[in-house]
A protein has these predicted regions:
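Active-site and NAD+-binding cores of ADP-ribose-processing enzymes
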Residues: 11-142
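Short acidic, low-complexity intrinsically disordered linear motifs used
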Residues: 1-11
Length: 142
């Protein structure tokens, strides 16, 4: 069972980012809506709180654009430095910092985190950003 301090520490960064950005995050993608396909934190829609970082990802795409998205309130998000994230990675035979460019690996990581009750994952690095596993939990802002 988590201590009160662990709960505060794990929840606070995501909560802070969510409130600071008023639930609005950015995505650099191709004009057809495709991202880079790296999948470091699992499979889903990747976002960042940095519009300049999103622009860098857009610049690497064919006819890249930056889109804004509103993220649904109340999602349970895994910090990539948390014990739960480490547990999910350990279940896949990896250390928390060891990741793969494999889509299959990203799919397995997503499954592990979903089994632990998470809707997505995040890093404190704007290049790694945030992944929301289910697109129903984000809405594009036109």
């Amino acid at each position: 069972m988590k201590t009160y301090q662990q709960f505060l520490t794990e929840a606070s960064l995501w909560d802070w980012m969510y409130k600071k950005n008023k639930a609005i995050f950015y995505r650099g993608e191709s004009s057809s809506g495709k991202g880079m396909g790296i999948g470091m934190l699992g499979l889903g829609i990747y976002l960042t709180w940095s519009d300049s970082m999103a622009q860098k990802f857009a610049d690497k795409q064919t006819k890249g654009v930056v889109q804004s998205f509103k993220v649904k309130r109340g999602l349970k998000m895994a910090d990539n430095t948390s014990k739960d994230f480490a547990k999910a990675m350990a279940n896949l035979g990896r250390k928390p910092w060891e990741w793969s460019h494999s889509k299959e690996f990203s799919g397995f990581l997503t499954g592990e985190l979903k089994q632990l009750g998470y809707d997505g994952a995040y890093s404190d690095n704007p290049a790694e950003g945030i992944v929301i596993f289910d697109k129903k939990n984000v809405k594009e802002i036109k």
